[in-house]
Amino acid sequence: MLSKQIPLGIYEKALPAGECWLERLRLAKTLGFDFVEMSVDETNERLSRLDWSRVQRLALVNAIVETGVRVPSMCLSAHRRFPLVSEDDAVRAQGLEIMRKAIQFAQDVGIRVIQLSGYDVYYQEANNETRRRFRDGLKESVEMASRAQVTLAMEIMDYPLMNSISKALGYAHYLNNPWFQLYPDIGNLSAWDNDVQMELQAGIGHIVAVHVKDTKPGVFKNVPFGEGVVDFERCFETLKQSGYCGPYLIEMWSETAEDPAAEVVKACDWVKARMAKAGMVEAA
């Protein structure tokens, strides 16, 4: 049995699609998860959540209270479409407005951590100017988050700008703000030429949550657990021995599968078995 002190969550996109959060949280509870991570991506459907009415926001809060399944984090990837670094002032302003709305939304519904995607640009060519604008955009975003007491946490990415904890720590030191931390993805971290265990140890004290998925070099999504390059047992051991006690989030994109719940159960059992081998079990 996993330790009660190890919060284990599931990504929203692993579960059946839809906008009923009461149903989603009930299913997550049935599957044995402690929390669900919300996605606000670049689609109009998920972006519209940031414009939810007071009644809609209260419905989410009530679903959390009724089920006991938390929604403590948001994966905010909408800035791929509306980059904070855009040379188009209107697009950049829209990106900052998305950040402002996301922080306000988090404050309203109890989300503690907003995971940021470490792209300066996604659909354009990066250069020194986009990197500079990225730093400036982060600085402005963290100032907003500080006032709201919401943590912004940088994901380790499938993109060279932010493909290691060491690189993300550079931004943490540059910003020097307790409301900016790290949210590593052990799959992305392992797919690059990183000393994964050293990187994880270097991040301790700044890591607020961990994404769990498998990857291969150049393949960052939809790699079945056990078929990629991630040494899960060693990663879990390193995090445990380094004193990390925070949440783990199984990241999957099975919402359109024939039976998403079955896919999630299979993955969850696999991950829990590796956690058990790493000594992350409840004392008898």
Curated annotation (Swiss-Prot):
InterPro entries: L-Ru-5P_3-Epase, L-Ru-5P_3-Epase_Enterobacteria, Sugar_Epim/Isomerase, Xyl_isomerase-like_sf, Xyl_isomerase-like_TIM-brl. Keywords: Isomerase. It catalyses: L-ribulose 5-phosphate = L-xylulose 5-phosphate. GO terms for molecular function: intramolecular oxidoreductase activity, interconverting aldoses and ketoses; L-ribulose-5-phosphate 3-epimerase activity. The keyword Isomerase applies. Induction: Induced by L-ascorbate. Repressed by UlaR. Its EC number is 5.1.3.22. It comes from the Bacteria. GO terms for biological process: L-ascorbic acid catabolic process. It is an enzyme of class 5 (isomerase). SUPFAM superfamilies: Xylose isomerase-like. Pathway: Cofactor degradation; L-ascorbate degradation; D-xylulose 5-phosphate from L-ascorbate: step 3/4. Pfam families: AP_endonuc_2 (PF01261). Catalyzes the isomerization of L-xylulose-5-phosphate to L-ribulose-5-phosphate. Is involved in the anaerobic L-ascorbate utilization. NCBIfam families: hxl6Piso_put (TIGR00542), PRK13209.1 (NF009688), PRK13210.1 (NF009689). This is L-ribulose-5-phosphate 3-epimerase UlaE. The gene is ulaE.
